[in-house]
């Protein structure tokens, strides 16, 4: 384990217990932690302090998929492309249409992970009608800064068990906990898609069209 004045080192846990052990040791040394998937959005925001980088890239794989129930669970490091391909094979999709910002932020193309999508609340233009990524998240498994493994939410929307911690983690960029698995809603693919382009509209009319 490096001390706090040295450059970042990369850790890639392949199991929850490995992640817990890593965070436990990091906490002893009081080092800052940067959480990434494949690092496609590392170019966004302020550069982190040198410390330890934890990548969830080795925590991958779909753990549950029930097309008839419109629900899927996947480990955080599962590539978004793999998730979307499996959904498409069953005529389904992610309704919030996460886009690929890798090239725009200096990262690689096609490198997003499903955990990274929810950790950053990455949502496309369909969020206006379908809601953002956080609105589709049903539950999550995560490890906090005390190396404690916890689960929040479940596989159904009506899951009244107190605070919705899973949705609180969405958009937190890994600053609250490291998500290791996410469960989310999926939707049927539309039979057809039409794109409309309007130009030269006044602001009030443009807003009206969006809503």
Predicted regions and their residues:
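Short glycine-biased active-site loop of nucleotidyltransferases that positions the nucleotide triphosphate
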Residues: 42-48
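Short, well-ordered secondary-structure micro-motifs within conserved domains or adaptor modules
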Residues: 49-54
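Short amphipathic alpha-helix segments
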Residues: 200-211
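Short, acidic (Asp/Glu-rich) active-site segment that either coordinates a divalent metal cofactor
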Residues: 168-190
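Flexible, small-/acidic-enriched active-site or ligand-binding loops
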Residues: 156-160, 166
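N-terminal glycine-rich flavin-associated loop
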Residues: 2-35, 56-110, 118, 122-155, ...
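Glycine-rich beta-strand-to-loop/alpha-helix junction loops that act as flexible
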Residues: 35-41
